[in-house]
């Protein structure tokens, strides 16, 4: 079989391509060895230092340009790399190496050279003209000390730990009192030891203001109620009503505390409740819940009017011998149970309504509807059974 011209043509093309590949491999191998001599590796992070080291090596750039075999970025030509890192073929200054520093080198990531005289050196951490971008700047030259952490400025407008003399700092609440305003409460000559006058609601327990303002009060001032002698008009708190619990511990002028009418809630009175006087008109007591009344509840007086118990009352007594009594000035009703559980609940099943009325003379009518009507048929049926047995 004779070889055709086409076969020889294809063979020549293949051999030429192989020789070209070998030439490129040689060029790239030489370029890679030169990179290693400058300490460069395949790591992109070392690209800047390695290429700057090879800026003056013409053979390196020639090898690299023969096949564009950059080991860093195959998409960037050798010419572009040299122009960027070596300032070759670029006018108007470079973005890389420079001995005196570029004016627009703010884009540099703090290269070894080129940022010493940058105008936009705010990202370098160096001290600037105003020190606003300094990481460790104490702002010693600031007149106002607005950003000082622990300054000793005279105005102290925003000091955290100030030693102000003018007293305009935020932590000094009594600037008019001067240095005496911050003295301890024990040295306040105008305040009593126990704050006996005690008309100040916040001083009833401690006897002195926390900020020491009681030291400046006198007996004749309008605000002297916290440290006056007794002639202050603002000190007279004896006219407070019985419901003011705050005045119960405020000195001798407080008339509250003698009344113990602590009845509250919906009729559940715990402890002893005594109320004297004349209770006239309509008096309604509504008991809700379990109906247990702890303690003693007594009322004395004329007792005229009506007493009505309504609602969903449930009086339960489960002890051995329980009793429930309700006494007023004009009526009395009582229930007693022995050894059993007596329960009144619901409507029409033992609850009913208990109404006592009269004119206070002790007479009246007590009506109970419902009651224990369910027990009557039980007793009658038992009696009939017993009678039938006796007859037999």
From Swiss-Prot:
How does the protein's chain sit in the membrane according to the entry? Lipid-anchor; GPI-anchor
Q: Does the keyword Lipoprotein feature in the UniProt annotation?
A: yes
Q: Which domain of life is it from?
A: Eukaryota
- Here the segments flagged for biased composition (Low complexity) are 96-147, 162-191, 199-232, 251-371
- Where is carbohydrate linked to this protein? 75, 139, 155, 195, 270, 274, 294
Which of UniProt's keywords are assigned here?
Cell wall, Glycoprotein, GPI-anchor, Lipoprotein, Membrane, Secreted, Signal, Virulence
Span list, region Disordered: 95-375
> What Gene Ontology terms describe where this protein resides (cellular component)?
extracellular region; side of membrane
Amino acid composition bias (Polar residues), ranges on this chain: 148-161, 237-250
What's noted about post-translational modification?
The GPI-anchor is attached to the protein in the endoplasmic reticulum and serves to target the protein to the cell surface. There, the glucosamine-inositol phospholipid moiety is cleaved off and the GPI-modified mannoprotein is covalently attached via its lipidless GPI glycan remnant to the 1,6-beta-glucan of the outer cell wall layer.
Q: Does the keyword Nucleus apply?
A: no
- UniProt function note: GPI-anchored cell wall protein that may be involved in cell wall organization, hyphal growth, as well as in virulence.
The record places the lipid (GPI-anchor amidated serine) at: 363
Any idea what this protein is called? Induced during hyphae development protein 1
Signal peptide range: 1-16
Question: What induces this one?
Answer: Induced during yeast to hyphae transition, during biofilm formation, during oralpharyngeal candidasis, and in response to serum. Regulated BY FLO8, NRG1, RFG1, RGT1, TUP1, TSA1, and UME6.
